[in-house]
Amino acid sequence: MSAQTITVYGTTWCGDCRRALRVLDQHQASYHYVDIEHDDAARSYVEQVNRGFRSVPTILFPDGSVLVEPSTSTLAQKLAALNG
């Protein structure tokens, strides 16, 4: 996985996760999807970032920043900023 790859932590049943993945696809962003229901380390990371909650999507960017349950516009703005 490239150092420039975005990591999306989510679940298969999460509508907001599917929406975020669509936005990433529309922006042709490189990302790695991790289902927290099948990855204990990923679930622990999401809980750590979200103070014990399993809030998804939790999106980790190459610059180290994290967005949790971002709106479509917030995610699009972040992607635009990364592509500068």
Indicate where each model-derived feature is located:
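Local sequence-structure signature of Cys/Sec-based thiol-disulfide redox active-site neighborhoods
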Residues: 1-29
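Short alpha-helical
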Residues: 15, 41, 74
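Short amphipathic alpha-helix with an adjacent loop that forms part of the alpha/beta core around
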Residues: 46-50, 79-82
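Non-catalytic, surface beta->alpha helical segment in thiol-disulfide oxidoreductase systems
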Residues: 61-84
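Structural micro-motif
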Residues: 50-60
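Thiol-based oxidoreductase modules, predominantly thioredoxin-like and allied folds used
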Residues: 29-43
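Short secondary-structure transition/capping segments
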Residues: 2, 44-47
